[in-house]
Structures are given as structure tokens and as C-alpha cells.
Curated annotation (Swiss-Prot):
Keywords: Aminoacyl-tRNA synthetase, ATP-binding, Cytoplasm, Ligase, Nucleotide-binding, Protein biosynthesis. It catalyses: tRNA(Arg) + L-arginine + ATP = L-arginyl-tRNA(Arg) + AMP + diphosphate. One of its GO terms (cellular component) is cytoplasm. This is Arginine--tRNA ligase.
Length: 578
């Protein structure tokens, strides 16, 4: 609808230029926002205030001329001037009802991407292997997953890449410890304790550390025995990751793994190409790129080190190789990096070096989608009581158990199987939604009590809201797609719900553009609240006429489908009963 209004305004501006009211050469960014007060319309634009000065007119006078120049539209019932010169647009309720009827008949709910379809790489999750995933991996994994789902729903070709840390000193450490302590595969499956023991030896024994580094050199040289051990450790670690992804209902598989080791063969070429471009400077034996845009507190350019004095490569080297691969091999239009916002400087530097070196041969937009920290109740990074890292699988298991106990208390008559299933859906959904509902760049405090509450902006509330809609149709013995008739908007609660339903596509395009799933969370929470008001004030099954009942059932059906689709795009399962 906003695009329709922008087009109408653009036609009016063209008319006013032709009439000599506005000077030629104007190309304003036409802004159309949702009106805050529905009594003053559904949408508002400040275009008259933006152009009043070049027009040499008062904003309200220009607004009046704009209204007179606006083409007639079946979508708009009237346009009014408000305040200093806002244009307030009232949408035609019949046209709105027709759009919703069309959305209900569409598998995609009438949602279309605002721009052309693109190929998008999503760099997400990326745990360091050789140990189990911890809570610090949650945000990259589920935010990246949600944005990937939205992009796919809008029609983009999404390539998920799990840039795991599968190379480096930690593997030499594990191999050295395994040589000292031969164990069975079953014992090795407890990778966390094995890693902890190896790290202790590495920190306490210089002889052990030297041996571990030597094994890394042998691994890098392709030693068959070291490669076999490395593969063994990597496979065990990835299997742990996959179990966590499946529990989280995240669309990541082994086929999506594109770890650091995948770029090993290109690292020397990256350095050579940077040198050929004249970008490298030797500093204390290391090969660096200095960028004037990035300086330290003394005003000196910061180095982007791509090769250490001992010949070793760094994260920047691998990331540059990945940029080149994603642009020139995958031919991606966008590459979205869901990595902690504390890495912003690193990625800004890498992206700039890649551009200068010509590594981005295919025009590719590189975006660091940074995120804040998940903290404990004390506002500090989430830790165990003894200060250790919390395994992600342990956190999710506790969430399931807490939700199970809560559901059992409320519904003791359910079978054990039903309780376990509902407990898992609610528990995992609660953890994910509590994270996704916060602005991506914000820190937040993890709180089981708040996220498992059935009131407020939580997963349990939204899951229950969906079951409430589903319950209406269960009583009828019908599905959402089995309601005849047409939507007719008369009551205010019907119109409010309808107006919000019509914004689903706009919301999803916003998420896709900015990588912000919290926008979708807020929308679904608002939609659930509007449905609750509609349900309480507009009888559905006890409607006065058949036509009214069918109309309200169709509104309910579209609400149910939108809630279900929205939750699915967040990576949350839904329940038909709770």
C-alpha cells in the first residue's frame, strides 16, 4: 500500500512540475509512514514539508495543491492535511477487504519482495570446532536462520555457509593429547572434557605446547596421520553441532559447512595478489595492508595483517579468500555476516581491502550484521556458577524441562508424550523468541521466568494465540482454507485487524533489508493482541448473519495463517492445542 501511495504522490509531483508550481530537477525520497493515530488516517507523508522551500510556498498550501493533483485511486477513500502540512491518507476499506481475500487465496499470503530476487550468502553460526557449542553461538545461529528463512520466503536464492573454525592450534593440542592418552571413540565423544584436559596440558607444559604446534605444522603440510586425526576430531565436533541445530529447528546441515580449512589452498594466492596490487607493506616482518580510513588513537593507520612474520596466516586472510569465493565463484549479490558486533572493525577492514584488491569481481554487497551479547541476570556475559561457559545443549535441555513442568502443572490430564512434545516446542521456542524479539544490536539478559510467561511478548503467548485461532476452526471441523464468502469490514476491531494483516509483506521486506527479526516479533505480538480484541468484541460463530460469520471466519483464518507463517519464519514450531 505504501508503494501505491508513493506512486500517487510521484504522479502529483510530476503534474505540479508541469504546471510550474514546482521547479524541475527535484527527486525527493518520498516517505510514507504508518499513521500513529487511526482517526487521522492510515498513512502519512511529509512530502509537502520537504518541498515547501524549493516551491517557495507554505507547507499547507503546497499540501493542498498536492491533494488536488493526486490521481483518483480505488485504494484511497480520502486525503486530509494535518498539522504543519502532513498528508494523511485513508485507505478504502472495500479495497482493503479485497486485498485480504486475495491474500487468503494465495499460498504466499499476498507477500512479494519489494525488489528483484537475489542470490544471498548467509554466514552464520560458525562455532570453533574441537569443543561443543556454547550459549555464545546462539545469536548468530538463530538470527541468521530467521533472516535466511525470510529471504527464501520472499524468493531469494539463499546459500547458508557455516564458517566453522576447523583449523589451527586447537587441533594440534588435541592430537598431542590423544598421543599421550589413547582413548576409545566412545570416550572421545565427550569432546568438551577432552578439550579441557588438553588445554590444561597446553597451558602448563611448554614441551607439550611445542609438540602441539609441531603437529599443526605437519597438519598444514598434509601429513596423512595428522589429517586422519583432524578429520576424526572434526567429524565428532560437527555431529555435536548438528544435534544442537536439530534441537533448535535451524536449517543448517553438514552440506552447509564451509569452514576455514576450505580456503587453505587460496591463502598464499590472496597474499600474492595483494602484493601484486601494491597493497602490502612489511611491518616487523609481517605482511600488512594499511588503510587510512581506520586509525588508532594516535591517528596512525591500523594494519590489516594477512601474514605473520613466521609465514602463518590469520583470520583476515581467510575472510578475504571467503569474500573472493562468494563473489567470483558463487556470484552472490549480497553476503550477510551474522557475527558479534565486536568484530565490526575487523569486517569493515576486510571488506575495504577486498574492494581495493578487486576481489569483489561480481558486484556483491557485503554487510556485517553485528549483534549484542546474551548476558546473565547480573548483566554480565552468561556463565555457569563457577564462571565457565554454558553448553548450548544444556541450556536448551533445561528450557525443555522447565516448559514441561509448567505445561504439566497447567494441563495434568495430557499424556506424557503430549507433555514432552509441548514442553519441547514451548521451551525451545521460548529461548529463541526471547533472543529474536530483542533488537539485533542490543545486549539482553537471559531470564527463564520471563521468557516462559504466557503473558507479554513471549513465545508461549504467541503459541497460545495461534491455538486460540485454530480452536475456532476445530469447533467447525474446517481448515483455514475452507471458509466461503468474502471479507466485509464494518466494525472498528475488524478494520484494525485487517489493516495490520495487510502489512505482513512490508514487515518481511523490512526484516530482509535490515536483518532484524525483532521487527517480525513485534508485528506478530501486535497482531495477536488485535485478534484478541477482535475475538472478544466481534462474535464469530455467534455472528448476526451468515455473511458476517463468513467474513469474520475469513479474517480469523488469515490471522491464523499469518501467525503460523510468521512463527515458522522465526524458526518456531506451532501447536494446534496447548
Amino acid at each position: 500500500m505504501k508503494d501505491t501511495i508513493r506512486q500517487l504522490i510521484q504522479q502529483a509531483l510530476t503534474q505540479l512540475v508541469n504546471d510550474g508550481v514546482l521547479p524541475e530537477g527535484l527527486s525527493p525520497a518520498i516517505q510514507v509512514e504508518n499513521a500513529r493515530d487511526k482517526t487521522h488516517g492510515d498513512f502519512a507523508s511529509n512530502i509537502a514539508m520537504m518541498l515547501a522551500k524549493p516551491a517557495g510556498m507554505k507547507p499547507r498550501d503546497l499540501a493542498e495543491k498536492l491533494i488536488n493533483a493526486l490521481p483518483a485511486s480505488a485504494d484511497i477513500s480520502k486525503v486530509e492535511i494535518a498539522g504543519p502540512g502532513f498528508l494523511n491518507f485513508f485507505q478504502n476499506t472495500d479495497a482493503l477487504a479485497n486485498r485480504l481475500d486475495a491474500a487468503l487465496a494465495d499460498a504466499r499470503l499476498g507477500v512479494r519482495k519489494a525488489g528483484p530476487s537475489e542470490k544471498v550468502v548467509i554466514d552464520m553460526s560458525a562455532p570453533n570446532l574441537a569443543k561443543e557449542m556454547h550459549v555464545g553461538h546462539l545469536r548468530s545461529t538463530i538470527i541468521g536462520d530467521s533472516v535466511a528463512r525470510v529471504l527464501e520466503f520472499l524468493g531469494d536464492n539463499v546459500i547458508r555457509q557455516n564458517h566453522v573454525g576447523d583449523w589451527g592450534t586447537q587441533f594440534g593440542m588435541l592430537m598431542a593429547y590423544l598421543q599421550e592418552n589413547p582413548i576409545t571413540s566412545d570416550e572421545l565423544s565427550d569432546l568438551e572434557n577432552f578439550y579441557r584436559a588438553a588445554k590444561k596440558r597446553f597451558d602448563e607444559s611448554e614441551e607439550f605446547a611445542t609438540r602441539a604446534r609441531g603437529l599443526v605444522v605437519k597438519l598444514q603440510a598434509g601429513d596423512p596421520e595428522c589429517l586422519a586425526l583432524w578429520t576424526r576430531f572434526k567429524d565428532i565436533s560437527l555431529s555435536h553441532c548438528q544435534k544442537t541445530y536439530e534441537l533448535l529447528n535451524v536449517k543448517l546441515t553438514m552440506a552447509d559447512v564451509m569452514g576455514e580449512s576450505a580456503y587453505n589452498d587460496d591463502l598464499a594466492n590472496v597474499v600474492a595478489d595483494l602484493k601484486a596490487k601494491g597493497l602490502l607493506v612489511e611491518s616487523q616482518g609481517a605482511q600488512c595492508v594499511f588503510l587510512e580510513e581506520f586509525k588508532n588513537s594516535e591517528g596512525e593507520p591500523l594494519p590489516v595483517i594477512v601474514q605473520k612474520a613466521d609465514g602463518g596466516y590469520l583470520y583476515a586472510t581467510t575472510d578475504l579468500a571467503a569474500v573472493r569465493y562468494r563473489s567470483n565463484v558463487l556470484n552472490a549479490d549480497r553476503a550477510l555476516y551474522f557475527v558479534d558486533q565486536r568484530q565490526a572493525l575487523h569486517f569493515n577492514q576486510v571488506f575495504e581491502v577486498a574492494r581495493r584488491a578487486g576481489f569483489v569481481g561480481h558486484p556483491m554487497q557485503m554487510e556485517h550484521m553485528g549483534f549484542g551479547t546474551m548476558n546473565g541476570a547480573d548483566g554480565r556475559p552468561f556463565k555457569t556458577r563457577d564462571g565457565g561457559t554454558v553448553k548450548l545443549i544444556d541450556l536448551l535441555t533445561e528450557a525443555k524441562e522447565r516448559a514441561y513442568a509448567l505445561v504439566k502443572e497447567k494441563n495434568p490430564s495430557l499424556t506424557e508424550a503430549e507433555l514432552r512434545h509441548i514442553g519441547e516446542v514451548v521451551g525451545i521456542g521460548a529461548v529463541k523468541y526471547a533472543d529474536l524479539s530483542k533488537h539485533r544490536t542490543s545486549d539482553y539478559s537471559f531470564n527463564f521466568e520471563l521468557m516462559l510467561n504466557f503473558e507479554g511478548n513471549t513465545a508461549p503467548y504467541l503459541l497460545y494465540a495461534y491455538t486460540r485461532v485454530a480452536g475456532v476452526f476445530r469447533k467447525l471441523g474446517k481448515g483455514f482454507d475452507e471458509v466461503e464468502g468474502n471479507i466485509v469490514l464494518q466494525a472498528a476491531h475488524e478494520q484494525d485487524l485487517a489493516a495490520r494483516l495487510a502489512q505482513f509483506g512490508e514487515i518481511l521486506n523490512n526484516v530482509a533489508d535490515k536483518g532484524t527479526p525483532h521487527v517480525l516479533c513485534s508485528y506478530l505480538y501486535d497482531l495477536a493482541g488485535l485478534f484478541s480484541s477482535f475475538y472478544e468484541n466481534c462474535p464469530i460463530l455467534a455472528a448476526e448473519t451468515l455473511e458476517q460469520q463468513q467474513s469474520r471466519l475469513r479474517l480469523a483464518a488469515l490471522t491464523g495463517r499469518t501467525l503460523k507463517q510468521g512463527l515458522e519464519l522465526l524458526g518456531l514450531e506451532t501447536l494446534e492445542r496447548m
